[in-house]
């Protein structure tokens, strides 16, 4: 989107370069219900256990002490992607309705950021990636 492109351009101008790091992580949001898109029992690192939650894959550009979040994508567990009725009822767009692992989502986002001209020296991620 134009907004994402502008965000990447500004972040690159301020932080981009060989000494910048692209940090890949995921964030879990605990949920009590079952209707929020992507909610399912899954590992929530903030809680240190499996819990009913939504999980997002994030990509942040950082140099020195300055971070800029450039990507945040919802992870859909197989319990969601294998249920076309649930996906349609929730309004999940067709391109996002197929199952992708968190590392696959991260690679798609890295490719998107590189194609947009973002410069970074290396990617940092935990063992889950």
What name fits each language-model region?
Residues 1-124, 128:
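Conserved, well-structured functional cores that handle cations and Mg-NTP chemistry
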């Amino acid at each position: 989107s134009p907004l994402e492109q502008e965000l990447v351009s500004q972040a690159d101008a301020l932080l981009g370069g060989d000494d910048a790091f692209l940090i890949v992580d995921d964030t879990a949001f605990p949920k009590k219900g079952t209707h929020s898109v992507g909610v399912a029992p899954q590992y929530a690192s903030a809680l240190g256990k499996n819990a009913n939650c939504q999980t997002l894959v994030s990509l942040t550009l950082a140099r020195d002490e300055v971070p800029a979040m450039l990507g945040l994508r919802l992870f859909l567990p197989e319990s969601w992607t294998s249920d076309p009725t649930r996906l349609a009822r929730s309004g999940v767009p067709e391109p996002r309705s197929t199952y992708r692992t968190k590392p696959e989502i991260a690679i798609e986002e890295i490719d998107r950021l590189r194609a947009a001209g973002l410069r970074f020296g290396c990617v940092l991620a935990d063992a889950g990636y």
